[in-house]
């Protein structure tokens, strides 16, 4: 009699994805972030569902409904802060996951990589809309500033912005539709995650060497299930330390002031995980140019397979490329810092230089250095 795990139509899918899946024997902890993102997604959907039970998406009551959740709902405060800080953990894992893909050349799995980039855009859109829902000052002004960027699109820009707003300013209609989109998008993301995994399992995982591991595979369970569980426990530990000790560390104090269209906060800035892109946006004096740079700063990931000039897939044996990679990481951290600073003398020029370096590294320096390394291999 065959094992039900291998014969049952549903169990078979789970078995082939998480139990009997042949996995490379040498994948490091950088390969943990995929499963951690799954944990984050489940956590966000669950906490979000419980928050949605008590939240009202109306401009008059949205702010007080969030206050009500924190004060009156049983454990509402912990659910709210787990959801808010869970988003931060989500983005930490996302950026680590993308960084791993760049370092080890995982972008050569074209379908998996492209679905991943679409997922990144969708998670960013979801997080942005979620930030608007508490209807604090930064929620309102963040929504106003970011949606207004679309008015830079020639000819249709103004109509497009008013269509998204559902009126002539960010108001009740905007909040209601943002809540609807914020609720539905995670489920679309979940479906896309399955597509992402489907494409990944067509080829199998990459590994730190970038060399085919077909001759040295081990079953996913128990080796990587136990490794993923350890990773998940550490993630939850980090999240709970954040939630229970410094829940407002990553938030903006302005969001504890109810939204007021007549009073602009001195410094409008998004959540920390968007600051690098915000810095790139602000570093270009022209509105349309800034918007294009903002979109390209993420969309550039799609070009990574085209920009790969090296004969080797991974950066493991390419010290010069490694230097550039870590320079890119440092540059992104610099941009993140600049994005949170006011627009004044030293910060403007630092932001512009960091933005130029960002595009220069990816589009010019990395391919050039890869070509040089190819020539060094001949010596």
Curated annotation (Swiss-Prot):
Residues binding heme b b566, per UniProt: 97, 196
GO molecular function: metal ion binding; ubiquinol-cytochrome-c reductase activity
Subcellular location per the Swiss-Prot or TrEMBL entry: Mitochondrion inner membrane
Cofactor, how bound (note): Binds 2 heme b groups non-covalently.
Cofactor(s) needed for function: heme b
Entries under Gene3D superfamilies matching the protein: Cytochrome Bc1 Complex, Chain C
Family: Belongs to the cytochrome b family.
Note: Heme 1 (or BL or b562) is low-potential and absorbs at about 562 nm, and heme 2 (or BH or b566) is high-potential and absorbs at about 566 nm.
Protein name: Cytochrome b
Species in which this protein is naturally found: Tragelaphus angasii
Name of the gene encoding the protein in the UniProt record: MT-CYB
């Amino acid at each position: 009699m065959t094992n039900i795990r291998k014969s049952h139509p549903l169990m078979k899918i789970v078995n082939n994805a998480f139990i009997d899946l042949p996995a490379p024997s040498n994948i490091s902890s950088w390969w943990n972030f995929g499963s951690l993102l799954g944990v984050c997604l489940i956590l966000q959907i669950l906490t979000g569902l419980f928050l949605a039970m008590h939240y009202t998406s109306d401009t008059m009551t949205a702010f007080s409904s969030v206050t009500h959740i924190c004060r009156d709902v049983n454990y509402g405060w912990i659910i709210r802060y787990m959801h808010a800080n869970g988003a931060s953990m989500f983005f930490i894992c996302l950026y680590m996951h993308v960084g791993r893909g760049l370092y080890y050349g995982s972008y050569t799995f074209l379908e998996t990589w492209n679905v991943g980039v679409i997922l990144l855009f969708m998670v960013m859109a979801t997080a942005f809309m979620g930030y608007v829902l508490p209807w604090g000052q930064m929620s309102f002004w963040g929504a106003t500033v970011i949606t207004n960027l679309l008015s830079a699109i020639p000819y249709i820009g103004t109509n497009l912005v008013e269509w998204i707003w559902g009126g002539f300013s960010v108001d009740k209609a905007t909040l209601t539709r943002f809540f609807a989109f914020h609720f539905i998008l995670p489920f679309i993301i979940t479906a896309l995650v399955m597509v992402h995994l489907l494409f990944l399992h067509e080829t199998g995982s990459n590994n730190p060497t970038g060399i085919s591991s077909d001759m040295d595979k081990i079953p996913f369970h128990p080796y990587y299930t136990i490794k993923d569980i350890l990773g998940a426990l550490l993630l939850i530990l980090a999240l709970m330390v954040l939630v229970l000790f410094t829940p407002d560390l990553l938030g903006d104090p302005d969001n504890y002031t109810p939204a007021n269209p007549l009073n602009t906060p001195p410094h409008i800035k998004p959540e920390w995980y968007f600051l690098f892109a915000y810095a790139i946006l602000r570093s270009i004096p022209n509105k349309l140019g800034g918007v294009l740079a903002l979109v390209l700063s993420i969309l550039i990931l799609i070009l990574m397979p085209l920009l790969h000039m090296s004969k080797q897939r991974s950066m493991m044996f390419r010290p010069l490329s490694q230097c550039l990679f870590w320079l890119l990481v440092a540059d992104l951290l610099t941009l993140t810092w600049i994005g949170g600073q006011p627009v004044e003398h030293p910060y403007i020029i630092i932001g512009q230089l960091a933005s130029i370096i960002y595009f220069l590294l990816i589009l010019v320096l990395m391919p050039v250095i890869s070509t040089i390394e190819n020539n060094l291999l001949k010596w």
